[in-house]
Amino acid sequence: LEKEQQSTRKLKHLLILLSRLLALTALIFAFAQPQSKNGEGQRSGKPALLIYLDNSFSMTAIGTEGTLLSEGRELAKRMLQTVSPATRVLICSNALNHVEQRFQTKAEALRYLDQIESYALTRTLDDVLSWQQRQIKKHQELKEKLGQIKQVFISDFQQSQARLEQQKPEANQSFFAYQLKAQQNQNAYIDSIWFAKPTHHINTDQMLMVRVQNFGTQAKKRLELNIKIGQIKRTMFMQIDAGAEQIASFPYKEINNGSVLCQAHINDQQIHFDDTWYFSYEVPDQTNIYLIEEANSSPNVAKAFAVEERYKVWKTLPGQVSSTALAETDLIVLNGLDEIPSGLREDLITAHQNGQRILIIPGEDITFNDYNPLLRELSLCELGAPQANALNLQRINDADPFFSGVFEKKQQKWNVPMVKKAYSVLNATNSSATPLLIARSGQALFMRSNTTAFLWTTALQPSFGSMVNQSLFPTILLRCAEFASQRYPNYAILGKDAQIKVRASHSNEAPLRFISAETEFIVQYVGTPNNLRLQIGGTAALERLKAGLYELKGIETLAQIALNYNRIESQLKLLSKSELIDLLESNGIKNCNFNQIKEGQSLTAIVLKESNSYWRL
């Protein structure tokens, strides 16, 4: 009996132990998510190799065996030599265009790798993975089933690429990351340029600012910076601490006229795509002003513009406005109108959308239902009933670019009586308009919306005060006209800006082209009267256009356009192995092999074996 009881207890203990082992095994399997080669996870079909070769500008950094891009190209070729002839190959770069959507033979893939050059657009990991998944799905739906799928990513893996949404790879997909590292993680580059004054006129003083960044751990003791502004050339040498920036200033007197082609250039040894910043501007011969006023409007507006010959003023009544004249003008001024006819209001909105600047000076008894719809469209504050309390000028927003170069020193608080009455501002807190003259009550007496629309909140008639007798009044009117003379931006950025707005007329008789010494490109555009929206965000533009200065030409030259590369990869901040693996695993990619290449790709063994995921403790 005792032996039977011992046997029973022993069997009971064994059963308990077995059940615990089975439970533990189940837990391990649940967390590990194992992949079976003989079950549902294994598919029959042709093997596939997908290679992403990062060709963004950071890959132009110098590695042990040339640029990182050339090393990556050779690494991809070596991978292709290891696969069987039956393997379906898909090569993609940052272009992700229609050419790269097709699976190729090994021979075709090798030829295509030689065609991949630097590209102005960067891609995130999510961009590439999602695009590859779509191509895999489409190929299997339209062509054939795929067996084992290996996806290879060759890149320096910038932190700017570190965006990834949740992925759901199939069991037959495995992933391989090859990180190429430059010899030096150093880069000096031109970050941006700007002018002390936002407008340009012949024989006036101007100052160019150039900001240079020094990324890395080594100081720059004698970095050469060369400046060319039309006929003006300057050189200086900069000292920049490691990880610091410096702003160089170049004062000059404007001796150029018409279109002015410019560039700033540094001599850096590591990466070169960001060593030059191109820009352009116009010194106009004439600015056209269209003055819409009533018979009783203040004559002081026209007198203010008459002090300089370059301002050509055309006057008209509200009922006689020409749409053609509106389209051809630089600055439209509404002077003292009480009513704005609906047709004129629509023409003004269209003109503003086409790039014309608008200055509004209200009449002394305005119809708010005429004014406020227009003000809303121009992103200006709406006006309410006149008020007369605390309207002494207290502050000038002299830090705003509108007043750049106007005052020699910072303006202190004022308490100057300028007007007796002003229209109240109804929606100041919800408006994006910028107040430039502020009364003691906090109300804006003058404001702007960007640099395209300007509004006085007081009328010029004597019942509202003596604004026309203040020295600020003609100064502000002339500054509005100066802003109106700019027809196109100083520069645009490839890979960031989708379009460039140019105020110019173009006939469809000839194609619209970007022309430089190296290339000629027919540009896509959307045209309205005296306004062109040039499309530079498409695949064709990004593949053909390089950073530089371009003549915009139809039948005749319309503008000089400066294009620059995006500086998003100028700071060489790389993902570490743990950061990359954690990013992938947290978003569903749990079987990625990581390889880092520091001493040249030719010394790196190519091992594209399946990798299984394990439960990470």
Cite the ranges covered by each PLM segment.
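Acidic, S/T/G-rich, low-cysteine, solvent-exposed domains in lumenal/extracellular/periplasmic regions
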Residues: 159-173, 177, 296-487, 546, ...
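VWA/integrin I-like adhesion module and closely mimicked acidic/polar interface patches used
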Residues: 157-198, 220
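C-terminal signal-anchor/stop-transfer transmembrane helix together with its immediate cytosolic
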Residues: 1-44, 331, 335-338, 346, ...
